[in-house]
């Protein structure tokens, strides 16, 4: 590959920009504490995981053997026997959510998708793409789904086979919908467990809850039918990706034979990135579960540190249990742009992903927010 001098200069400028901002992130859930340099040599090859990793494919350059290992690992931490599960490495959380909703639609073809207003914005898009009826549910103050409103709307719609989109960590507040509560409430109105579907969006918290002492309900053992997690969030990856796991019996409904590649296919995308499979495989093989627990505990400790610092000066910051997302009043535009914060209405958040090895970046942000909010308060009262 030969670039012109101008293009070489442009790409060098971007390289330096990336170096400068490598660890910038405090407002979005992207861990940057990864090193996949041992895998760089594989970028010489076009590795394509088209089709089903458990079957033979006529496309020789695939990483199916590694994908099988990845899926066995996630079946274990999401508490489903490997032989009863199926899933794959996706292009990201949205594809995983679409896969779960697709399975649900094929199981209950004329049903409504119920999700809270704190759900990720992509779910409305998924409902349109899959041509599913959908219903937005109110949220509680902490970001959880409003269970009373959920049941009220299911009853109002006379829904016999609701499809529940459960958040295992909402985008803005890290709130976790109570899967067991949802099942209890549905049972109270006479809807049997076999008559509805629960998909769990665990984009960030899916790699937190398996490694804490007192996790909220999140797994197949707790009653879900499918779950997805992002690879570039808590795990960390230079390329966005994700993992989706579902019950094999439901996946078989959408499986088709593809003679072009001599294999079966049951994925959303056709060609799939074989390199991200290697990244996820290396990530799970290079750490023990004890090391993951220690990493998560550090992130949670940093989150509580941020809450304590805010609250010490009277700023009402908070976080949900087992969440590394710290919510606080939205500062001025100058501050949230300076620190690349995600904002929604009158709130902002910081996220203590694992590359925050000490409190320096957290302190820098908090100092600016305190100065900004306290200054605004003084101006409001006329000082």
UniProtKB/Swiss-Prot annotation:
Signal peptide: none annotated. One of its GO terms (molecular function) is histidine decarboxylase activity. It catalyses: L-histidine + H(+) = histamine + CO2. SUPFAM superfamilies: PLP-dependent transferases. Its EC number is 4.1.1.22. Its cofactor is pyridoxal 5'-phosphate. HAMAP family: Pyridoxal_decarbox. Belongs to the group II decarboxylase family. Homotetramer. This is Histidine decarboxylase. It comes from Acinetobacter baumannii (strain AYE).
